[in-house]
Amino acid sequence: AERTLRAAAGPRAVAVRAARDDISPYLQGNDILRHLEGCGSCVLLACTLGAGVDAALRAAGASDMAYAVVLDALASVAVEQTADAAEQTLRNEEREEGQFLTGRFSPGYGDYPIAVQNDLLRLLDAPRKIGLCATPAHLLTPRKSVTAVLGVAGHPVTGRRAGCANCALRERCAYRKEGKTCE
């Protein structure tokens, strides 16, 4: 499966830095605003493994479902590694300018609407630059792709820590009712 993934993947990323005020219409929801507290600007990021991975997943699913599940899991890890590498490059660039980044915060996290996905792709010119689009239902295509917003500040920032204390579902969470967490 790893060989298939390596042959099919064409990892690409695009990022744009923007003043927070300039992209405020796309920062909808309390969770993203909390995440960006203390940040005067943002970096928009999109990463994809490319359409070749989608084709490999379709082919695997048609012939061997167990293999397709393994390939899908490997591709999920690979796109996160691609995003991690892009984020580290951005961190290094910002550090040279005396700036610091929060972690990634993606559409669909907390109350940050997934519908923002299409706007982020447009702002990044992602369809042209890396071949990344979204369906009318705001799902990314190719599937193994990530979009995110990172905050930029002149001092170390961490954003709001993920976890039960900051979760919008805290009061009705099925995990918490069972004494567990999703962390």
Predicted regions mapped to residue ranges:
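Active-site helix-to-loop segments that bind/position phosphate- or nucleotide-bearing substrates
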Residues: 1-68
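Compositionally biased, low-complexity/repeat regions
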Residues: 1-30, 95-183
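Long, amphipathic alpha-helical coupling/dimerization segments that relay conformational signals between
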Residues: 61-114
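Residue-level preference for alpha-helix termini and adjacent loops
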Residues: 35, 48, 70-73, 104, ...
